[in-house]
């Protein structure tokens, strides 16, 4: 549920780089044909496999059977302590609000966070996606 098209564009570029599918959960803070989205994704956007769903319920239904890690600053477990395997789904919230509390509660055992000093409320969404995506690639031993 990104609010900022530039973040979504950068996330799309990261997805292309690591071979991941990008899911958007509506409502979005921009239109999917937004010029800022395309500019941030550069010419990689045409190579990005993506899909949009109407809400979190629809996303969890579509991803039933997939193992997930959810990223939230409210998690107890650090990203570095998680085991990633190919086929896992990484779920991130929106810049302004993060993941819905109901989703965090439902999947509490699957929630992870990046460490940060208490003076920082949150990290940039695109930076967080990039960091976690490449930690998973590192654990896989590289790209396929």
Residue positions per predicted region:
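Post-transcriptional modification and biogenesis factors for structured RNAs
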Residues: 1-144
